[in-house]
Amino acid sequence: MNLYPINAGNFKLDGGAMFGVVPKSLWQKTNPSDSNNLIDLTARCMLIESGSRLILVDAGMGDKQSEKFFSYYKPWGDDSLIRSINNAGFSIDEITDVFLTHLHFDHCGGATVLNSNNISVPLFKNAKYWSNKNHWDWATSPNSREKASFLNENLIPIEESGQLCFLDVKSPGFNHYDELGFDVLFVDGHTEKQMIPKVSYSGKEVVFMADLLPTAGHIPLPYIMGYDVRPLTTLEEKRRFLNLAVKEGYCLFMEHDAHNQIITLKETEKGIRFGGSLSLKDL
């Protein structure tokens, strides 16, 4: 097995929204903001090469939307999904599976693209697209709070193409899925049934954190995004996960942290905190 970091692009979001009730005087120590209160973020996906399978975990926000749409998210840098896949030595037609942790636009937008007729179609024509029915139903009949994050042009083409597949939601904790060859944890704080994958690699357990832990600055328990639909649920999910991660020595692959690809954790007098920064090449 091989794992590759795939940078699908970089963007900025309001630091206050990213840290909820935590004062700026605290969160800016780890995530400094610009003059508009925006902090640097990235869309770091992961590519899993396992036998004949090439599984992409998340796909960034893509480039289908209007200039006005992107003006809110201030893209920066030259990274892109297709370029990063090519730089890893693969083509988009070789992708066999796309595992979408959840269907907010910054995680799934790159999975579809506009064709020559300006119609949104799946980018990965030979791939199965994985979600779960609970979350799919949640996203396609969205609540008012999340409606702006669930975009039909990102979702409907996947369903209409016949490439959409659902994982069964299993009991709490990590459960193994033979369909994909790795374990998945379902969490409900950020959105309904977000899927967190865990991959055994080089003798380590690598967990793709998605929005359960957006950046290393979110490790302290109360540091929860204002975007989360159930913040108290996130608090308990983080508590359970972080305790398990320290106990088992997990390596946390950070999707949105612009500065840390992988982090480790350690116990301190103040609770679980940042232990160190690594990359997949270090494992």
Language model segments and positions:
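Active-site beta-strand termini and strand-to-loop segments that position acidic
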Residues: I48-G51, K198-S202
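Residue-level marker for buried hydrophobic side chains located in beta-strands
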Residues: I55-V57, F99, Y129, V206-F208
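Metal-dependent catalytic neighborhoods of phosphoester/phosphodiester hydrolases
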Residues: C108-I119, T264-L265
